[in-house]
Amino acid sequence: MKATHPVLFREVQRFRDVWWVMVLVFGIAALQWWLLLAQLLSGRPVGDNPAPTAILLLYWLLFGVGLPVFFLLLRLEVEVTPNTVLIRYAPLFTRQIAKNEIAGVEPLTYGPLREFGGWGIRGWGGRVAYNVRGNQGVELTLRDGRRVLIGSNDPAALAAALAAARGEPAPATAAPSPAIPPSGS
């Protein structure tokens, strides 16, 4: 990302750093490779209801090659400048939020499965989340009432950069999300 303004905060998170996602992705890929090679090398269709070789090649391209490459390239980049918050879920899309659109900033601990149904780009209950892993982030409340949660490995630094961009004092450290009851209750 090229910035014309000084960068107050920048973080890059990659799905390839989440071991269980990579085990799943490469397990699916390995199965596709095995099916294709078994059918091509033996010259006989694999299984009781085999797919034609052309269909197997298509599946191999999509899941044996495409899926691993996609997950190796997939990353969440967050950049805060004095004027904007840039959220890039590469290679899918980029979202830019101007600082004057932001009404509030709150670092929090959230439940990605319970509140959003998982990780990635998720919309749930009038909120949208951009996250890769973990349960820490910063929620932006926009002037139109929409809420945007940005997952972060360093929510305090992200919140401080957002506050600095808006000319406000840094918010307190991450608090539990309202959807997660405090421990001990």
Predicted feature residues:
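N-terminal membrane-targeting/pre-transmembrane regions
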Residues: M1-P52, A129, A157, A175-S185
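Short, ordered beta-strand-loop transition motifs
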Residues: K2, E79-T81, V132-R133
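Non-transmembrane, membrane-adjacent beta-strand/coil modules in membrane-associated proteins
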Residues: H5, V12, I87-N153, S177-S185
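Short N-terminal helix-initiation segments at or just after the protein's N-terminus
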Residues: W19-L24, P45-A51, V78-L92, R147
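Short, charge-rich amphipathic segments
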Residues: M22-S42, A54-W60, L92-I102, G167-P171
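Loop-to-helix transition at the N-terminal end of transmembrane alpha-helices
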Residues: G47-G66
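Conserved beta-hairpin
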Residues: L62-E106
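C-terminal/domain-terminus segments
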Residues: I150-A174
